[in-house]
Amino acid sequence: MKIQVLGTGCAKCKELTKRTEEAITLLGLDVTVEKVTDLNEIMRFGVVMTPALAVDGTVKIAGHLPRVAEIQSVLTTALA
């Protein structure tokens, strides 16, 4: 599983990274979070509002800061 946080480094983007790492730990997953900060690369995902979370190359959350539980749900669904 490839997990990417898309954002330019703003406070919300950093918080999404932190919450995503927490969700990964709570789920006991052995994956790392890649930070995508290049605006051109973010735009290739079709994201117009950050922060965003992509799993295996597909944007699952964009434009808001989700709670840890929402991130866990997204990751669990992606594993199924």
Name what the model sees in each region.
Residues 1-19:
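Local sequence-structure signature of Cys/Sec-based thiol-disulfide redox active-site neighborhoods
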Residues 50-80:
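C-terminal structural segments of small proteins and small subunits
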Residues 2-3, 32-34, 73-80:
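Terminal leader/tail segments of proteins
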Residues 9, 46, 57:
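Conserved functional loop/turn residues at catalytic and ligand-binding sites
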Residues 15, 38-41, 70:
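Residue-level recognition of oxygen-bearing side chains
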Residues 29-41:
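Thiol-based oxidoreductase modules, predominantly thioredoxin-like and allied folds used
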Residues 14-17, 47, 65:
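Conserved strand-to-helix beginnings and helix N-cap segments that scaffold or border functional pockets
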Residues 19-32:
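Conserved helix-turn-beta segment immediately C-terminal to the redox Cys motif
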